[in-house]
Amino acid sequence: MNGDCANMNFRPIIAIIFFISSVSLSFNSHAYQEIEVADGATIQGKAVLTGKMPYPRIYHLILFPNIDMCAEVDTDDEMNRVLDDFKISKDGGLKDVVITLNHVEAGKPFNKKPIIIDSEDCKFFPEVNAVRQFESFKVNNLDAVMHNSQVYQKERGKIIQNLPIPPESITNGKVTFQKNFKIFQMICGMHEFMQTWGYRIQNPYYFITKLDGEFKIDNIPPGEYDLNAWHYLMKTQSQRIKVAKNGTTNINFKFNGDKVIRPLYETIKSGRIKKDAAYPGTAKGRELGK
């Protein structure tokens, strides 16, 4: 009788141990493994914007605190902060497109630099980051005023972190996505036009385009993968590719300026989008990539 009771008591414990072990093995089997890559391949190309330049977003500074300091950059004659979401080169190269290679289970080491987001003149730099799950980051406030950083999971989604940033100080944060979420947006709760974006990466095979729109990802294990291109106001593009040993594959991505994805609260009727506002240093409404 006592032996039967003992066996019955142990069965739930054994089941729990088995479950935990199974979850651990499942997690580890999907974790990226750093290995030495032999005969690695290269993917290179360019992201461009075609069609007409999308209208910029504007924020009336009179509605926000610290107007004198915030008007130091990216402000028009009507005291509107103008957000330059589409930075382009003369030939249409598009900046801040995150290129990622999916389904790489093992390959080169990350060697990723820590994320440091600067806040100066009521503006976050850089405007786009590549982020890993549970990665720490720092917000360096160079302004003499306080900012309140709110981190959203996806665009205007659930707030996953609230970071008060005292004047001229550094605040620490940490990225924690729920399952299947890839995008975070950080906005200052006091100055809504202060925005920066992050895109979740699973491996070190990624690239954030500069002003020329060009990208290059190297040392890739030969195989078949999905190559994605993401811009925070455009639909993600994807191409299935196969790379060979020591080979170079050329891939380009074209984003149509007429197909910007904006939330409903950012429309011309709401006053957030202004047709006659000019991007800093660019010609508005001109044809691109032709």
What kind of feature is each model-predicted range?
Residues I14-S24:
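Bacterial N-terminal signal peptides
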Residues A31-K290:
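Extracytoplasmic copper-binding redox domains, predominantly the cupredoxin/blue-copper superfamily
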Residues S26-N28:
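N-terminal signal peptide c-region/cleavage motif recognized by signal peptidases
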Residues C5-A15:
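Bacterial N-terminal signal peptides that target proteins for export
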Residues A6-M8, V23, R81:
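Intrinsic-disorder/low-complexity peptide segments enriched for small residues
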